[in-house]
Amino acid sequence: EMCIRDRYDTTDYENIDPQYGTLETFQELLTACHDRGIRVILDLAMNHSSSSHPWFQQAAEYLKSLPEGEEPDSSECPYVDYYHFSREYQGGYAQLDGTAWYYEARFWDGMPDLNLENEAVRREFEQIADFWLDMGVDGFRLDAVKEYVTGSTEDNVEILSWFADYVHGKDPENYLVCECWTDQNTYAKYYESGVDSMFDFAFADKSGIIANVMNGKAAATSYAKNLETEQGMYAQYNPDYINAPFYTNHDMGRSAGYYAGENSEAQTKMGNALNLLMNGNVFLYYGEELGMKGSGKDENKRAPMYWSKDGNAEGMCKGPADMDDFRMKFDSLEEQQEDPDSIYNYVKQVIRVRNQNPVIARGTTAYLEQYSGEQCFALTRSYEGSNLLLLGNTSAEAVSVDLTGLTVGGTTAEELVLLGELYTGEETAERAGTVVTLPAYSILILGEE
């Protein structure tokens, strides 16, 4: 349960925001998902609570009643050690109303930072984890992990190690994925904690690897090359890591806005494919499969799912109060479902290819420099004796690649069979001996028989 628009200021960690329903309706959702083989994880913001949370309220009341010059005593009020209070102002701190005290609040003064190095706070979060996991939740997305102890990767890894040990101790299948919005070298280190996954920010957002490649700001090779090199970066900290690729999220402009001009629909489609063909557990922000629009202020990035162009249709809602009024660039789900060439049906096709070939998600990437260039990338993905070849043309022109000398597993280029083809236009790929011609913005997946 939370107060403000973005719902990251928790007032009750063991309840559902009434705007979304009740614990009973949540249990129904869990059951319906599990019946369909879908696992459900919840977003857990441990870095901070709401300033309206009873823990903070009690700490604030205690400090307000404390005689001047007297030091706080946690035996009188344990909650005073749940947060970081100080008599001195520091960067990232806010003043406690009506007192000379300050408290850490990295995001804003309505979200005071919790002291996760305090054992009592850890016990609270173990109970909170128990509450949801015992109900049947399958794990958590951990919000803002680099702010647990702002500026100290080492301390943050220690805090995550405690939580990962606890959650995996209950069931090793419980899944933890962390948001650490920083550079790749830094978030790689967080794998040392034993969490399953870190969101792979390097590939995301309007200046990430995928958008740069699709916009022609970076060579196609950089996609394949980075997929290969990041594996070693992450595995050195945890050989059992599971990558968590994503393209956009609720804090980023939507990808349909990254591209302008006559090829923008093709670029929007293929950008989604480059995300969905990465290995690991891929995340897709709702509405990206429609090419929804939304940029600028946060509310615009969190517009309601575009089920129908009829605002009164089932499932449609108004969206956040401060959201701008804007028109969508592409059609609603209702219309796109009927159009075989829509972004929606393209994304469905990519997911089908991914699911039909488990090596895509599970395999190890090798970048094929000899067959890659400015406009085209080539990589292999291998898992337990299965091997496949991914070829992609990220440009607006057809490109030919000569695969002479290439073997995938034990199979020569000419003998590879077609596993999947993803096109954004009318043209299809052609194979003549070892030469493959890829139309604009297309992907070919070849494998062994």
Kindly give the residue locations of the regions a language model identified:
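Hydrophobic faces of well-ordered beta-strands that scaffold small-molecule active sites
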Residues: V40-L42, F140, L176-C178, P245, ...
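C-terminal beta-strand-rich structural cap/linker in extracellular carbohydrate-active enzymes
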Residues: T428-E449
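Beta-strand-rich binding/interaction modules
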Residues: A398-Y423
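Loop/helix patches that line or flank the sugar-binding groove of alpha-linked glycan CAZymes
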Residues: K170, Y175, F246-N249, Y258-S400, ...
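Active-site-proximal helices and loops of the catalytic beta/alpha 8
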Residues: H34, N47-H48, H53-S74, I128, ...
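Short, acidic/polar
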Residues: E119-L133, T268, N272
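Short glycine/proline-rich turn/loop motifs
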Residues: Y102-E117, N249-A256, D324-E334
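Acidic/aromatic-lined carbohydrate-recognition and catalytic surfaces
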Residues: E1-R123, D134, V145-S193
